[in-house]
Regions:
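Beta-strand-loop-alpha-helix segment that lines the small-molecule cofactor/substrate pocket
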Residues: 1-2, 48
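An acidic, glycine-rich surface segment that forms the CoA-thioester-binding/catalytic face
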Residues: 4-33, 65, 154, 158, ...
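CoA-thioester-processing core
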Residues: 15-25, 31, 37-91, 104, ...
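C-terminal long alpha-helix characteristic of the crotonase
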Residues: 51-56, 98, 107-158, 171, ...
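Helix-loop "lid/cap" segments that line or gate small-molecule binding pockets
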Residues: 89, 141, 145, 162-168
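Interdomain hinge/lid region at the active-site interface
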Residues: 169-173, 179
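Terminal low-complexity tails and localization/encapsulation signals of metabolic enzymes
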Residues: 178-191
């Protein structure tokens, strides 16, 4: 994923890719190249617009490691894709090509490899020629923003935090990364 600044310039305390959990008033465009699994897909889901290269793969493979996509991926993917498609991605952890992501509406454009930054900047130029206050207001209304918070996301974050606690304390959460590091298939215990 190509990110000019990987943090909000006015909120360095949010850390790398911190805008997944915070509302940004200006339009955000993800320029994605290569593999965007886990956090890369979660950044794309948190962005207003997404431009991806032909070779790009999207996915939330956390379940393959005994984890869940805790940076908004689980509750956002069902808003971006048809429910059955989203559930397949969540349950299998398998990746989706940029062509399929475009077909299902997860992204806005697929561009030739090596051109994603230029394409994202061209899209930004089409936005910046419009009245900023109207663009920002349109974003707030479309996202259901009240007092700088996307109100629908609050419930999703609450559920995610509640579930991640139990998952992270599980034996499976230890086994998944261990098996990955040892280059073997995990032995799940459901505990």
């Amino acid at each position: 994923m190509c990110i000019r600044d990987s943090f909000h310039p006015e909120h360095g305390e949010w850390g790398f890719a911190g805008y997944v959990q915070h509302y940004v008033d200006k339009p955000t465009i993800a320029a994605v190249n290569g593999t965007a699994l886990g956090g890369g897909t979660e950044l794309a889901l948190a962005s207003d617009l997404v431009v991806a290269e032909e070779r790009t793969k999207f996915g939330l493979p956390e379940v393959k490691r005994g984890l869940i996509a805790a940076a908004g991926g689980v509750f956002r993917i069902v808003d971006h894709l048809p429910r059955k498609v989203a559930m397949e991605l969540l349950f299998t952890g398998e990746p989706m090509s940029s062509a399929d992501a475009l077909k299902w509406g997860l992204i806005n454009q697929v561009v030739p490899d090596g051109t994603v930054v230029d394409a994202a900047l061209a899209l930004a130029a089409r936005i910046t020629c419009n009245a900023p206050l109207a663009v920002w207001a349109s974003k707030r209304v479309a996202n259901g923003v009240d007092d700088g918070v996307i109100t629908g996301d609050e419930v999703g974050w609450s559920r995610t935090m509640r579930e991640i606690g139990g998952v992270m304390r599980s034996e499976d959460a230890k086994e998944g990364p261990r098996a990955f590091a040892e280059k073997r298939e995990p032995v799940w215990q459901a505990k």
